[in-house]
């Protein structure tokens, strides 16, 4: 069986020649050069991904939702009962949650994966990759062992690669877990070097009078566990959670197949920061769907060098933003593959990117 290091070494580089060809093709389409801006840039980015073989296209779509509980819930950093994780995961299997609605609209399948829900028995209908019944309380101990983190990463990478073999070409990540914005903030603080006060937000409607405690919990977790910001696995194992590890695994797995993965909100930014520490080569495969309303979102995205496509003031999680942005990916592919060409219409435009066909 391949090790994590072996799999990380298989992540292919983006193909600059394919991107150059895509740029020339797009510049010849029936529009002023550059007039579709970020949509054009997205199509060119997709063309450079080896898994799409130089032609931006979307086959099957999948949103992978990592579900887990967190020991740090005991510190009073969330107002929702811990049992909500299992209840909502079960609702996902019925197709009744927010991500299920948005994924259905986008034509994507939702894979609900138990990586650490705190229930006595596995929940029927979930994909069972459970490591433990919740992670450790990061305010008093590591979230998990390094071995547990590496094994879960490998399991999720392999699952993602298997989906790719079965025709999935566009992945989205999501999560579900009460109190999980606390470890996410700890990861963001650790890797960006920003103070917890700058990145800790209210999560799922935490009252503002409880925010100081949440900031203190994140600060204590980092001080106690001393995660190495240069080592993504170490950060995830010490101050992360199983859902965050799982999302990082999807990113690494998709990138190893040369395929795009849509980020969701703040939790996914944290997982992406850790994944990029493991392999900077994955960064061109990450597509930011929307700007999370969580406090540390801009800090995390700035560190990643990513600019989201949507700003809907959302902070639901679940992969809702990733599902919502899937039609944008398809739109970029549509203009690339289906638009007419200037030459075929005998239109000659001056080399002015601000020109307009109607001017």
Curated annotation (Swiss-Prot):
SUPFAM superfamilies (UniProt xref): Nicotinate mononucleotide:5,6-dimethylbenzimidazole phosphoribosyltransferase (CobT) (SSF52733)
Superkingdom of source: Bacteria
Assigned keywords, A-Z: Cobalamin biosynthesis, Glycosyltransferase, Transferase
Reactions it catalyzes: 5,6-dimethylbenzimidazole + nicotinate beta-D-ribonucleotide = alpha-ribazole 5'-phosphate + nicotinate + H(+)
Listed GO MF terms: nicotinate-nucleotide-dimethylbenzimidazole phosphoribosyltransferase activity
Enzyme class: transferase
UniProt GO BP: cobalamin biosynthetic process
InterPro entries, per database record: Nict_dMeBzImd_PRibTrfase, Nict_dMeBzImd_PRibTrfase_bact, Nict_dMeBzImd_PRibTrfase_N, Nict_dMeBzImd_PRibTrfase_sf
This protein's record includes keyword Glycosyltransferase: yes
Keyword Transferase included in the entry's annotation: yes
Residues forming the catalytic site: 318
Pathway note: Nucleoside biosynthesis; alpha-ribazole biosynthesis; alpha-ribazole from 5,6-dimethylbenzimidazole: step 1/2
EC numbers for this chain: 2.4.2.21
Pfam families in the cross-refs: DBI_PRT
Physiological role: Catalyzes the synthesis of alpha-ribazole-5'-phosphate from nicotinate mononucleotide (NAMN) and 5,6-dimethylbenzimidazole (DMB).
Quaternary structure note: Homodimer.
Stated family: Belongs to the CobT family.
Name of protein: Nicotinate-nucleotide--dimethylbenzimidazole phosphoribosyltransferase
Protein source organism: Shigella dysenteriae serotype 1 (strain Sd197)
Record lineage: Bacteria, Pseudomonadati, Pseudomonadota, Gammaproteobacteria, Enterobacterales
Gene name as annotated: cobT
